[in-house]
Design a protein with these regions (language model features):
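Short glycine-rich, polar/acidic loop-and-turn segments at beta strand-coil junctions
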Residues: 57-60, 240, 261, 272
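Conserved short strand/loop->alpha-helix "switch" segment adjacent to the catalytic nucleotide/phosphoryl-transfer site
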Residues: 213-241, 290
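Non-catalytic regulatory/interaction regions at protein termini and inter-domain linkers
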Residues: 1-202, 206, 217, 225, ...
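Short aromatic/hydrophobic contact patches that present stacked aromatics
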Residues: 27, 237, 316-318
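Amphipathic alpha-helical segments that form the core helices of the histone-fold
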Residues: 44, 240-244
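A short beta-loop-alpha structural element at the N-terminal edge
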Residues: 206-212
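Conserved beta-strand-loop-beta-strand hairpin that lines the nucleotide-binding pocket
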Residues: 193-196, 202, 245-324
């Protein structure tokens, strides 16, 4: 099993006054004692500096943290990460909103978006979004994010990936620089690679601009057969419609929809001949002066997981929606 010492080398123990912008570091911890030791010190620094701090972890971590903080817990905001970050594409917008709520002030965050029990697909997307955090926030406002990794519950692949996506690693009460960090220009593109093939034979439906209405009907009927309730079925219809509309507008006038089921999860994938080049597409809240990305923003809000792969030969967007 890798440890933090395998991934880092000496650096200053704390952020100098000259350092500005986004400080993205990981904390490898073992057991509840390790979790509390690392997070309490980080939060105490924020409270001492009167910096707003948001802790986004699982509910099982919140209770011991609150108990250890005592009265200082009232000075900390908490979010349930399995709800907030079920789809990791919601995390960058959530942190951006936290920054906006405290405009002009340094802030801190504690995040555990990668936890034991995440599916392989979820872990892959979490790792991609951890890298995108650097692109989204580097060179911007001053804030620090401490990302937690459970050495007892995560495999070596997840631990290694953390070193590639985080420039700093918490160590001995300070931090070290990650020797394996891949900065801009070195990290793989956010949409590189291929999705694994469907786990079962999918239903395939070709579509063009004239087919969007019957396509919605087809998806609604299929979702009902997949045991989605009315509200979740409509979420799936909305997501597929947004993706298909994007294919019509930007992907060559049409595309191919694949639908299948994996356990309790309904899967839909839209393929077309377009290429997605904006790495943060769908990760910014739409505004009247920035209408682009609205479709993928909506898809990210209503789906449990969204996977995007794109190259010159075309794009594929796969969405997951659990039936329970």
């Amino acid at each position: 099993m890798l440890s933090s010492s395998d991934l880092c080398h000496d650096a200053p123990s704390d952020v100098s006054d000259a350092e500005r912008g986004f400080h993205h570091q990981t904390l490898f911890y073992a057991g509840e004692a390790g979790f509390l030791r690392g997070t309490l010190a980080f939060i105490a620094e924020a409270i001492s500096a009167e910096e707003p701090v948001l802790v986004a972890v699982g509910s099982m971590r919140v209770a011991p943290l609150r108990d250890s903080l005592g009265v200082d817990a009232e000075r900390v905001s908490f979010a349930d990460m399995p709800v907030l970050g079920r789809n990791p594409a919601r995390l960058i917008p959530a942190w951006r909103q936290f920054l906006d709520e405290h405009e002009g002030r340094p802030v801190r965050g504690v995040s555990e978006s990668i936890w034991p029990g995440r599916s392989a697909a979820e872990l892959t997307e979490c790792e991609r979004h951890e890298s995108l955090m650097n692109l989204a926030f580097d060179g911007g406002r001053t804030w620090r994010l401490l990302c937690l990794y459970d050495l007892d519950g995560l495999d070596e692949q997840a631990i290694s990936a953390a070193g590639r996506s985080h420039p700093f690693i918490a160590h001995n009460g300070g931090y070290r620089r990650s020797e394996t960090y891949l900065g801009e220009g070195d990290a793989p593109g956010p949409f590189e690679g291929a999705l694994p093939p469907p786990a079962s034979s999918p239903t395939e439906v070709s579509f063009s601009g004239a087919d969007l209405t019957p396509l919605r009907v087809r998806v609604r009927e299929w979702a009902a057969g997949g045991l989605l309730d009315g509200e979740r079925a409509e979420r799936l219809v909305l997501a597929v419609n947004e993706l298909a509309t994007n294919s019509v507008r930007h992907g060559g006038g049409g595309g191919l929809l694949l639908m299948w089921r994996e356990g309790e999860t309904l899967m839909c994938e839209v393929r077309d001949l377009g290429q997605i080049e904006e790495p943060l597409v769908g990760l910014r809240r739409p505004s009247p002066d920035r209408p682009s990305g609205r479709g993928l923003w909506l898809v990210n809000q209503v789906c449990d997981l969204v996977q995007i792969r794109s190259a010159r030969t075309g794009s594929a967007v796969r969405i997951h929606l659990r039936s329970v």
